[in-house]
Curated annotation (Swiss-Prot):
Listed NCBIfam families: PRK05412.1
The protein's name: Nucleotide-binding protein SAR11_0692
Assigned protein family: Belongs to the YajQ family.
Protein task: Nucleotide-binding protein.
InterPro entries (alphabetical): DUF520, UPF0234-like_C, UPF0234_N, YajQ-like_sf
Keywords, comma-separated and alphabetical: Nucleotide-binding
Gene3D superfamilies: 3.30.70.860, YajQ-like, domain 2
HAMAP family per record: YajQ (MF_00632)
GO CC annotation, single: cytosol
Molecular-function GO terms, alphabetical: nucleotide binding
């Protein structure tokens, strides 16, 4: 019976490379010279420090550009509100989102059931498993899942016949 898994994960080496490239460009850019700007990653938490809101916004846009260049979907970043830090700087804490949450999984399942395809979808922790008799139904489900906007990038793995 053909099946596939739906997952959402982050490639940490690629994310770290994008972060390093972003920091290198920040160090070279003229409009950031002499300013204390930092981006740090500890596990799934990214802390950005900038002197003001405008610079913080520029750093976030720059990080997103570098993520796209390294083929990491920028939707993996869940950006929180900014807060005042020591001195006159502003700190923003972001979180890397991995795995498909229960409510997103239920949303995907209801959308697939609306298509009335002969497939079964099961929630397995933070991923989904879809099984069906026809390969065409599974491929149609894959295209429908990519069309659903859940705010996370999804990948299809373990496609088996």
């Amino acid at each position: 019976m053909p099946s596939f898994d739906v997952i959402s994960k982050v490639s940490y080496p690629e994310f770290d490379n994008a972060l390093a490239n972003c920091l290198r460009e920040i160090g070279n850019r003229f409009d950031f010279k002499g300013l204390h700007i930092s981006i740090e990653r500890k596990d799934k938490i990214i802390t950005t420090l900038a002197p003001d809101e405008l610079k913080l916004k520029q750093v976030n846009e720059l990080l997103q550009v570098h993520l796209i260049r390294r083929k990491v979907d920028p939707r993996v970043l869940s950006i929180k509100n900014s807060e005042n830090a020591a001195g006159s700087s502003i700190r923003q804490v972001s979180e890397l989102q991995e795995g498909i949450s229960q409510e997103n999984a239920k949303k995907i399942i209801t959308e697939i059931k609306k298509l009335k395809l002969k497939i079964q979808i099961k929630i397995q922790g933070e991923e989904l498993r879809a099984e069906g008799k026809k390969r065409d139904d599974l491929q149609e489900a894959m295209s429908a899942i990519t069309a659903i906007d859940i705010g996370l990038p999804v990948e299809f793995v373990n496609f088996r016949d």
